[in-house]
Amino acid sequence: MEDRLVGCRLSEEDVDEVSLRPRKFGEYIGQTKVKENLMVFIEAAKKRNEALDHVLLYGPPGLGKTTLAGIIASELGVNLRITSGPAIEKPGDLAAILTNLGNFDVLFIDEIHRLNRSVEEILYPAMEDYALDIIIGKGPSARSIRLDLPKFTLIGATTRAGLLTSPLRDRFGVINKLELYSVEELGQIVKRSARILNVGIEDEAAEEIARRARGTPRVANRILKRIRDFAQVKSDGFITKEIARTGLEALEVDEIGLDAVDRNLLMSIIEKFGGGPVGLDTLAATIGEEPDTIEDVYEPYLLQLGFINKTPRGRMATKLAYEHFGLKYE
């Protein structure tokens, strides 16, 4: 169900998202404190002629973790190698990647919490000592040799920082949480993306899209592209507030960015479970979703809105959620 318009996961439709990504900190909107700190750390590393400390970026999907990794590599003036936790199946895969890095290069591992344990253990000496421990032979004659690696920077990204093991988490010198974006920041992102796409847009239309983008740049850019279609077919190609509203209504994205999936989740809690509490697994089975997807994709925005509460006994719909649907809160 993550092919929905306001889904935060990267989809095939987002393959051209790269063209909209900022390449320098000067182009990057939002995450001000994270950005300012990273600029200091990068400048210090360059002055000392050292590799930047390993960086962990965590937070909901679609907030720009991959984009930040690209900017860090660009600002350092080094190469960026991108992979993901599930793609590194065995220690040899990681060893091949590490030995092909250049000095001070950046290795970006998305979904780093999904690394298997044997691969993760290879990372420990690589991160700490820039070395690779390799076992040669088997049984009593087996011996370990240590290979020196280039001094590199690992940037790990995850939506689930709590699933990282302590030994891995403790080896990151820089740990940053990315927060959902404000409407004002998203409005700036929409206008910047519109310029890149050569689409004219009113300030009020950009704000309309931003208000319904769930605090997420990826969602804002995806909505912008669909509204561009409506402007092209229904009008002269220029996005007005009226065109934006017409398109968003047709796409069933409401005034605060909820779509049919969100409404189904909230109404299930309200109607089927009396407002809650309801356990995560039970709720997931009811709406046909995975528990992880509810936690990582749907809940961050609903929590930010104050529409649900997480309690030890399960999820509960709040008074604000009832009021949004015009229901009486009891």
UniProtKB/Swiss-Prot annotation:
Signal peptide coordinates: none
Region (Large ATPase domain (RuvB-L)): 1-181
Binding site for DNA: K310, R315
Pfam families the UniProt entry points to: AAA_lid_4, RuvB_C, RuvB_N
Catalytic activity as recorded in UniProt: ATP + H2O = ADP + phosphate + H(+)
SUPFAM superfamilies found in the cross-reference section: P-loop containing nucleoside triphosphate hydrolases, Winged helix' DNA-binding domain
GO-annotated biological processes: DNA recombination; DNA repair
Principal cellular location given in the protein's record: cytoplasm
GO cellular component, one term: Holliday junction resolvase complex
Binding-site positions, ATP: L20, R21, G62, K65, T66, T67, E128, D129, Y130, R171, Y181, R218
Compartmental location: Cytoplasm
Enzyme Commission identifier(s): 3.6.4.-
Location of the region described as Small ATPAse domain (RuvB-S) in the Swiss-Prot/TrEMBL record: 182-252
Annotated region (Head domain (RuvB-H)), positions in chain: 255-330
Single GO molecular function: ATP hydrolysis activity
Assigned keywords, A-Z: ATP-binding, Cytoplasm, DNA damage, DNA recombination, DNA repair, DNA-binding, Hydrolase, Nucleotide-binding
Residue sites binding Mg(2+) per the record: T66
Organism superkingdom: Bacteria
Subunit (UniProt): Homohexamer. Forms an RuvA(8)-RuvB(12)-Holliday junction (HJ) complex. HJ DNA is sandwiched between 2 RuvA tetramers; dsDNA enters through RuvA and exits via RuvB. An RuvB hexamer assembles on each DNA strand where it exits the tetramer. Each RuvB hexamer is contacted by two RuvA subunits (via domain III) on 2 adjacent RuvB subunits; this complex drives branch migration. In the full resolvosome a probable DNA-RuvA(4)-RuvB(12)-RuvC(2) complex forms which resolves the HJ.
Family, similarity comment: Belongs to the RuvB family.
Protein task: The RuvA-RuvB-RuvC complex processes Holliday junction (HJ) DNA during genetic recombination and DNA repair, while the RuvA-RuvB complex plays an important role in the rescue of blocked DNA replication forks via replication fork reversal (RFR). RuvA specifically binds to HJ cruciform DNA, conferring on it an open structure. The RuvB hexamer acts as an ATP-dependent pump, pulling dsDNA into and through the RuvAB complex. RuvB forms 2 homohexamers on either side of HJ DNA bound by 1 or 2 RuvA tetramers; 4 subunits per hexamer contact DNA at a time.
Domain notes: Has 3 domains, the large (RuvB-L) and small ATPase (RuvB-S) domains and the C-terminal head (RuvB-H) domain. The head domain binds DNA, while the ATPase domains jointly bind ATP, ADP or are empty depending on the state of the subunit in the translocation cycle. During a single DNA translocation step the structure of each domain remains the same, but their relative positions change.
PANTHER family: HOLLIDAY JUNCTION BRANCH MIGRATION COMPLEX SUBUNIT RUVB, PTHR42848
Protein name: Holliday junction branch migration complex subunit RuvB
Protein source organism: Acetivibrio thermocellus (strain ATCC 27405 / DSM 1237 / JCM 9322 / NBRC 103400 / NCIMB 10682 / NRRL B-4536 / VPI 7372) (Clostridium thermocellum)
